[in-house]
C-alpha cells in the first residue's frame, strides 16, 4: 500500500528534477519508479483529486482507496458563543503564499463590519518577502486585518477561535483539506474559498460547505487582457521549463 502525499509533479519542480536525476536517471523512467503498477500494489491518496490523478495515469480504480487524515480539535469549545462586540473572521493558517493573503485583504476592504485575523507568519525565509508585502499593503490601506495573532503567549488558539464569529479560508491549494473540517469541530461556521477538487469527497460524506465560493469574478474592463494573457503564457512556459518540458507549438 503506497500512501502518496505531495506529488512532485504538483508544483514541486525542484523535487521532481532531484528525484528524476537521482532515482531514475530521467523523467521518463521516474513514473515507473514512483508509481508501480502490479496486482499487489494499491494506492491510498488523501483526497478525490489525487485519486483521480492516479486513475487517469493508469492505476485501476479498485486499487486506489481514498484514505482521509484524522482531524484533531483546535482547542476551542464547540458550544462557546463568540466573545466581544466585534465580528471577527479568523484565518487559522501559516501564511505561506498559497494561502492567498491578498484575498483576505480584498474582503477586509469590502466588509466594513468585520475585523480579520491571520494566526501565524510563515517560517520559511523564502516565503517572508511576499508575506511582508501583504502586511505592508494592509497597513498602508488601513485595513482591519491583524497578523500573527496566534503568536501571542496570552491568547492560545482556542481562545482566538472562541472570540471569532467564523473561520475563513482563501487558500488556492490544499492537500487533504483540514481547513474545511476543523472549524466544525470548533463550533464555528466556515466562509471563504472552496477548492472543489479537494472538498468533493468531504461533500460526498455530508459536510455542508454551501457558504463557500469557487471563484471571484473580476470584470475584464479592470485590467489589460493582452498583458494578462502574456503573463499567463510566460508563467506556463516557466513551469514547463522548470520540469524540463517543451512548450507546445499552439501557445499564443
Language-model-detected regions and their locations in the chain:
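Catalytic binding pocket for nucleotide-activated donors in carbohydrate/polymer assembly enzymes
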Residues: 176-180, 184-252
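Nucleotide-activated donor-binding/catalytic signature segment of Leloir-type glycosyltransferases, i.e.
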Residues: 131-159, 205-224
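A conserved nucleotide-sugar
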Residues: 101, 108-148
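Conserved donor-binding/catalytic core segment of Leloir-type glycosyltransferases
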Residues: 44, 80-99, 105-108, 117
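A short hydrophobic beta-strand element within the catalytic core of glycosyltransferases
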Residues: 167-168
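Membrane-proximal helix-turn-helix segments that form the acceptor-binding/catalytic region
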Residues: 8, 18-43
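Carbohydrate-associated surface elements
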Residues: 49, 70
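Aromatic "clamp/platform" in nucleotide-sugar-dependent glycosyltransferases that forms part
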Residues: 172
Amino acid at each position: 500500500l503506497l500512501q502518496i502525499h505531495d506529488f512532485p509533479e504538483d508544483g514541486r519542480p525542484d523535487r521532481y528534477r532531484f528525484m528524476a536525476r537521482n532515482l531514475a536517471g530521467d523523467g521518463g523512467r521516474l513514473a515507473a519508479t514512483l508509481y508501480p503498477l502490479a496486482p499487489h500494489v494499491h494506492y491510498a491518496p488523501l483526497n478525490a483529486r489525487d485519486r483521480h490523478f492516479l486513475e487517469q495515469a493508469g492505476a485501476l480504480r479498485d486499487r486506489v482507496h481514498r484514505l482521509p487524515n484524522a482531524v484533531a480539535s483546535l482547542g476551542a469549545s464547540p458550544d462557546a458563543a463568540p466573545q466581544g462586540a466585534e465580528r471577527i473572521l479568523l484565518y487559522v493558517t501559516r501564511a505561506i503564499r498559497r494561502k492567498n493573503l491578498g484575498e483576505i485583504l480584498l474582503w477586509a476592504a469590502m466588509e466594513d463590519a468585520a475585523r480579520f485575523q491571520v494566526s501565524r507568519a510563515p517560517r520559511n525565509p523564502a516565503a517572508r518577502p511576499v508575506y511582508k508585502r501583504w502586511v505592508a499593503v494592509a497597513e498602508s490601506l488601513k485595513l482591519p486585518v491583524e497578523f500573527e495573532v496566534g503568536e501571542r503567549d496570552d491568547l492560545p488558539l482556542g481562545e482566538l477561535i472562541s472570540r471569532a464569529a467564523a473561520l475563513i479560508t482563501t487558500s488556492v491549494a490544499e492537500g487533504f483539506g483540514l481547513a474545511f473540517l476543523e472549524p466544525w469541530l470548533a463550533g464555528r461556521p466556515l466562509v471563504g474559498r472552496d477548492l472543489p477538487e479537494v472538498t468533493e469527497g468531504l461533500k460526498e460524506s455530508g459536510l455542508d460547505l454551501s457558504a463557500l465560493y469557487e471563484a471571484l469574478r473580476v470584470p475584464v474592463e479592470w485590467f489589460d487582457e493582452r498583458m494578462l494573457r502574456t503573463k499567463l503564457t510566460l508563467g506556463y512556459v516557466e513551469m514547463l521549463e522548470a520540469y524540463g518540458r517543451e512548450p507546445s507549438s499552439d501557445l499564443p
